[in-house]
Amino acid sequence: MINDVISPEFDENGRALRRIRSFVRRQGRLTKGQQLALDSYWPVMGVEYQAAPVDLNTLFGREAPIVLEIGFGMGTSLVTMAANNPQQNFLGIEVHSPGVGACLSSAHDAGLSNLRIMCHDAVEVLENMIPEASLDMVQLFFPDPWHKARHNKRRIVQTPFVELVKSKLKVGGVFHMATDWQPYAEHMLEVMSGVSGYLNLSEQNDYVPRPDSRPLTKFELRGQRLGHGVWDLMFERKE
């Protein structure tokens, strides 16, 4: 696995440019099992970053609806969804190697053939690798809320990002977000409502009930017992 999560960018004078990113690269230690999964299963399910569009049907070896998940953590929900929906192709992106290793291990144990994994900045992947109007769904579950006001600019859900997502969705494709931080949910709703070309699938024009397609996580179940809320938002590309 080529472990270049971000691609260096330079100005016309050769000086490195600094892009505001929604994540901090944490060099977590890999367990032996995670390292074994990276060594053994990355060649089968892993996808290296390239700064050019990829043919998604060739990538999966078949033509099927494509779901892109950004920031899958340890991959538990992603593997469950891929196992429950063999008629769909799933592409997961995560920047932290331990999560990639854990997901590869779980996917192998589940015998999945409809899942591909990337370890790179999702914004760069969307910008450069994903063809226009090629995705049936984009999933963004529990992204870092960046609680402090001075860090809000790091939140991944910003107008340029949701415009980028829209351009990669097919007409009728859906952008599904979930967060357990109410101020971030309100921020998501405000940003999404301000971008033309999206239709809010909520009957109340705000949040939707958790669809069965999104598995409950252990963290979420614990939060429910403690009375914590979770907000799901689903917006369809209409043009």
From Swiss-Prot:
It holds the Pfam family Methyltransf_4. Residues 150-155 are annotated as: Interaction with RNA. Its EC number is 2.1.1.33. Monomer. It comes from Yersinia pseudotuberculosis serotype O:1b (strain IP 31758). The active site is at D144. Substrate binds at K148, D180, T217, K218, F219, E220. One of its GO terms (molecular function) is tRNA (guanine(46)-N7)-methyltransferase activity. It comes from the Bacteria. Catalyzes the formation of N(7)-methylguanine at position 46 (m7G46) in tRNA. It is an enzyme of class 2 (transferase). It catalyses: guanosine(46) in tRNA + S-adenosyl-L-methionine = N(7)-methylguanosine(46) in tRNA + S-adenosyl-L-homocysteine. InterPro entries: SAM-dependent_MTases_sf, tRNA_(Gua-N-7)_MeTrfase_Trmb, tRNA_methyltr_TrmB_bact. S-adenosyl-L-methionine binds at E69, E94, D121, D144. This is tRNA (guanine-N(7)-)-methyltransferase. NCBIfam families: tRNA (guanosine(46)-N7)-methyltransferase TrmB. Pathway: tRNA modification; N(7)-methylguanine-tRNA biosynthesis. Keywords: Methyltransferase, S-adenosyl-L-methionine, Transferase, tRNA processing. Belongs to the class I-like SAM-binding methyltransferase superfamily. TrmB family. One of its GO terms (cellular component) is tRNA methyltransferase complex.
